[in-house]
Amino acid sequence: MGTLPARRHIPPWVKVPEDLKDPEVFQVQTRLLKAIFGPDGSRIPYIEQVSKAMLELKALESSDLTEVVVYGSYLYKLRTKWMLQSMAEWHRQRQERGMLKLAEAMNALELGPWMK
């Protein structure tokens, strides 16, 4: 990650160049990020402002994962990474519970195998 993030502007709370060095990087399932960031990433500016960090998302080819790159001061980027990973896990568990409830409901209705 030796290059600067491709953005039109860098938020005022991010100090250039020191906060752009050594970003926190992690991967999250793309469907979970859509739940976190809203349609078309509409919540990203708000999350950046509240967390005092800058986010960059990179879709990984041949995978359902997206790489999340977090820039900012040391504590802010660690806190933002933890927050986003926690939110992704919460959404994953919520979707999993929904699928289990759906399976239970289908079993309760005794739907034939052609309906499953």
From Swiss-Prot:
Single GO BP term: regulation of gene expression
Q: Which cell locations does it reside in?
A: Cytoplasm
What residues does the KH domain cover? 23-84
- Gene Ontology cellular-component annotations: cytoplasm
The coiled-coil segments of this chain are none
Q: What is its main location?
A: cytoplasm
Tell me, using the record's free text, what induces this protein.
Down-regulated in differentiated embryonic stem (ESC) cells, compared with strong expression in undifferentiated ESC cells.
User: Its Gene Ontology molecular function terms?
Assistant: mRNA binding
Q: Does the keyword Cytoplasm apply?
A: yes
The keyword Transcription is assigned to this record? no
Key words, A-Z: Cytoplasm, Developmental protein, RNA-binding
* Entry-linked InterPro entries: KH_dom_type_1_sf (IPR036612), MOEP19_KH-like (IPR031952)
Q: What does this protein do?
A: Involved in the maintenance of embryonic stem (ES) cell pluripotency. Dispensable for self-renewal of pluripotent ES cells and establishment of germ cells. Associates with specific target mRNAs.
> What protein family does this chain belong to?
Belongs to the KHDC1 family.
| PANTHER family in UniProt | DEVELOPMENT PLURPOTENCY-ASSOCIATED PROTEIN 1/5 FAMILY MEMBER, DEVELOPMENTAL PLURIPOTENCY-ASSOCIATED 5 PROTEIN
How is this protein named in the record? Developmental pluripotency-associated 5 protein
Tell me the organism. Answer: Homo sapiens
What gene is behind this protein?
DPPA5
